[in-house]
Amino acid sequence: MAQPPLLRDVIDIKESISTSDFVLSLAEATTPAGAQHALRDYVVTERLLENFDEALALIKSSLDGHRSKAAYLHGSFGSGKSHFMAVLYALLSGDQAARARTEFDPVLTKHQWLSTDGKKFLLVPYHMLGAKALEQRVLGGYVTHVKKLCPEAPTPQVYRTDSLFADIRAMRANMGDEAVIRALGTSGADDAEEDEWGEGFAWTPQLLDTALAAEESHEAGVHLNLTNPSTPAELRAKLVNDAGTNLLPGFTQNAAEDEHGFISLDAGLSVIAEHAKSLGYDGLILFMDELILWLATLIHDQKFVAREASKITNFVEGGDARRAIPVMSFIARQRDLRELVGEEVSGAAESSIQDTLNLASGRFDKITLEDRKLPQIAHARLLKPKDAEAAQQVDAAFEQTKRVGPQVWDTLLGSEKGTTGADAESFRLTYPFSPAFMDTLVHISSALQRSRTGLKLMGQLLADHRDELRLGQLVPVGDLYPVIAQGGDKPFTDSLKVVFEAADKLYKTKLRPYLLSSYDITEDDVEQYRNRPESLTDPKKLNGCRMFTGDNRLVCTLLLSALAPSVPALSELTIRRLGALNHGSVLAPIPGAEVGIIKNKVAEWAARFPEIKETGTDANPGVRLELSGVDVDSVIANAQVNDNPGNRVALARRLLSEELGVEHGQLSDQLGFTWRGTARTAEIVFGNVADEDELPDHDLMPQEEGRWRIAIDLPFDEGEWGPVEDVNRVQRLRERQQGERSRTIAWLPAHLSATRFADFRRLVVIDKALADEHRFDTQYAGHLNADNRSRAKGLLETQREALLKQAKGAFKQAYGLAQKQAADVVPDFDDHLVALPDVDGLTLSFGQSLHDGIRHVAGKLLTHQYPAHPDLDPDATGTAVKPADTKKVFAHVRAAAEARDGRIEVPAADRKLMQRIAGPLRLGQQKEAYFELSRYWGDHFRQLARSQGVTGDLSLITLTDWTDRPDPRGLPDFLARLVVAAFAEMDDRVWVRGGTVLDPAPELAAIKDHDALRSQPLPAESDWDTARQRFETVFGAKPPALRRGRMVNQFARQIIEAARDYRDHAADLVHQLEAHASFLGLDQTADTGRLALARRSLQLLDALTAEAGKGAAGAKKTVEALASFDLGETSADRYGTSIKKARAVAEAVASAPWSTLELAAGLGPEGEALLDSLRNVARDDQRTADLRDALARTQREVVALIKRTQAAATPPPAPAASQPTAGDLSLDTPTSDPRIPYTSQETPTSSGGAGTARTSGGRRTTAARAVTDLQAELSDLAVRHPEATIEITWRVVE
């Protein structure tokens, strides 16, 4: 396919560009020739017509008001300020060429005064850079300009004459007055005579004395006659003029270079206005270029800037009420000085300068020359096709460019914040320069350049690439940097100078040499490729030069982004935008893959140069270049001692451990991972596999049964070994192992390339340097000052991150997880996995990370080891099943096993869990809502038991082993226990430990290794139902419903516990009833009644506990005992009442007042009736009559009967006997302690049982009656106050 034509074939491109091609100096702009030159190529736009209208209106207003006015002519670099002034000069001077341009008709029609008023203007250009003061450049520049226009015109009086007059006085003293007068240009006496007749003027010594003694005067509006001066002021002015012209002609030139050689700017403006008027001008127009730039270059001399800035207002205001003619000043500026002051100055100085600038800005008009018309100007001046056919070719190429894709297209158009327009039409005008390029050009040029316009830079780029740039190719933004850097211009601020110099140094000493060495080419090769590509026949060098050119453009774009970060296209630069700005510079085999290629290049550069930093995100990566000027290499050189084998191995192991996710254990490193939904562990060992001293055979063997050991070699060897020797070592070990080989696998990497290994060693040095902050500050970076140490540390930290990222990427290739690149690894080794056992399908998965890759390998190993392991993570969530999950699953499995149809509805929250665990484990099937139990494990275990002749208990160990039949499943212990426990529920088996049934059944976590499962014999269903009914009736508790082995044990345990709880009380009841059977009239031979039921109840309880502790068979017998016990004619309800009330009844019988009750027999018919009633209750069972109530009631009734009987038998009281006194005491008794006997008066007892029981008393009575009386009285007290404590005292008195 034919190549497109060179761009020079369709657009006129000069071979070389000179400054005069596009730059118009101010001196030229204010001359007829300069105006003609400007008009010839000038492109008039609508906006420029508005600008001319603004300028002319300002001039007209100044003339009409006879007031000085000023305006900022604001425009960025290359916006055509000089051309504007040249055309303005042509319009003001009535130039025919200007009037012939029809584009100016609207302006000339509006400003007809230009042709009708006959006004004459003096336009004075100024270039302010290098000025020592405003007066020096403005006033001195005026004198210089006027001398060129009118050599005969008198010199305006703008100089301070102190030094001039001192020189004249010295010359008079040395040479004499005659010689001085002659040198002033007069003939002495002869001229004096002519003067008397008014025909001429001649100096005399007297006139010299008068002139030298006169005061300097610059009063506005005062005309000085210099032809025939007569006043002292006129003589002084005449002397200054003649001396400057004839006697000391170098005075004005010397004064022009002296900042103190001029009068004040305010006075000077009045002087030159008067002077211009004397020359016949109606207005004085001052065009000052670079005034703001001049102040900006001196911004750090705050006093100077403040002084000079305060003078700016003199252009519109002055001490004089009115100048001779209006002074109109146009001050060109690219940047508002107020912005620069804010950036470069701080504090009170900033405030003072800002106030001054604000004052001036408020009095100045502003005419803005837009950059947005630059596309039209560039098209007209540079990019116009040669002819119609060429225009069609350019249009076709542009349409092809529009197909680059939306993201690239948007980047090429630039940002809406751009200054040059951002639409397709603008792009078409500037093609092959994109709007983003144009915007960058304007910003960069404004920041760095002074003497070259944007058009010149564009022309220079076209000229430089005229032999290689073809139609359809865009001019890359990166090509702009070399053009700017080679120009020799420096930025106008010190801070930018430092950054620019740092960028230039970085590019020339590091970046460009690195790119050249990367492709093994030289500067001569590049020069040959650019200018004589056909002569470059070496394909390798040709491709290297092509790759270098693209990379160089990218690097130069990064430098531009650091120099002008405010450019929208370069701000927060992304990889995608970096490629788009240099569209076509990086070629990819697949369209759209350029971003990945550039991203890899940037990552490599960031690892090499600390100034380059990767930014952004994985989805939208970016890059930033920071210029600091800090000597980082010296810090690295000081830390070079850390580059040793030990540190290299340690860092490699650390990086691999972090990437692989390896945990450091006490005995070995371990890899924790999830495989098929279960948590697993593999053993890891790092080392040189080929070195048997470093890794002996025993270090390659797994330490724990069932685990795999993965030996990971490092991607470099300090000795002579390589990956092939690593493979040979494993093969030798494999041959030595016979039978079942060890579960060992070696992961062998390819070695790093020489370049990448050098980068890794650099990473070791930087990592160690940054590891110890104290050592970094005192040893490695001790030669730097504190600020540079901090910057160096930040740069090294950034580079460490880049090198880490690079190393990890290279490691990924080395271990076979990414496509091997010769720049990163040695690409001749692919046998990365070598296992001792034969493992099918043992391959690496391309594109995985090291973290995922090793888990993929470990999963393959476990698949080989446990081929039948179920997948408990079907959704690949990477989460492992936990014991808490199995507890929930088991609860639902048990519930299903207890259901008659083997299915239950599972709560919605647990259905996902049942699908994940129960299904793959073959415990059952979880459907939409219901879980249905499976018979798989029951059939599986029973079949194995039959085939192996196993009877009796099935141990947990045996059943766990059987889960690996016919193929190993390798279930974790807690999952194997879940399976066995589920089988226990399915097959209705009970857990036994040490031969004893575990009741209740243990939780999953409580199952021990030596536990076993036993078949539980079941009672007949009728017995089960009868026992359940009787248990609930007799004992009042709820029995289990399902007739299952575990339930039988549970039920038996409930029966036995209940029987044991009541047995002793039932026995006590029988004992008490038998002890009082005679009194209560109980027939001990009867088959019915209370005593008979109590005895049968005791027999029932004894029968229920007889089989306790006899295992599963005993449990069955216990249930059967309850079901088969002969209750006789008595219902279970009455048995239950007898048993449950046994304790209370036995206690009542034991504590009954039998002596009181026995008295009833001697109380006649009433007493006998009471006893008969009590005995009838005692003979009936407890459900029929409550014996406790009967005993208490009978006691009360007996006591009441006794009281009634006593009251009826007591005679009337006898007269009270007189009590003996001391006089009645006989003294003839033999005792020495005679006493008066006390005889208590008998108190009659209450006639009824009512009333309050006596709490004390005493009487004299006979012994026979005392028993009955005391018993009756105390019985009543016992009834009313059973807990009262009493004291009994008695003695024989007769």
UniProtKB/Swiss-Prot annotation:
The keyword Membrane does not apply. Induction: Constitutively expressed, not induced by bacteriophage phiC31, probably part of a pglY-pglZ operon. One of its GO terms (biological process) is defense response to virus. Residues 1228-1244 have a biased composition (Polar residues). Coiled coil: none annotated. Residues 1205-1263 are annotated as: Disordered. Transmembrane segments: none annotated. Keywords: Antiviral defense. Disruption phenotype: Strain is no longer resistant to plaque formation by bacteriophage phiC31 (a Pgl- phenotype). Residues 1252-1263 have a biased composition (Low complexity). BREX systems (bacteriophage exclusion) provide immunity against bacteriophage. Part of a type 2 BREX system. Previously called the phage growth limitation (Pgl) system, it confers protection against bacteriophage phiC31. The bacteria allows one cycle of phage infection, but subsequent cycles are impaired, protecting the original bacterial colony. The system undergoes high rates (10(-3) to 10(-4)) of phase reversion, i.e. loss and regain of phiC31 resistance. This is ATPase PglY. It comes from Streptomyces coelicolor (strain ATCC BAA-471 / A3(2) / M145). The gene is pglY.
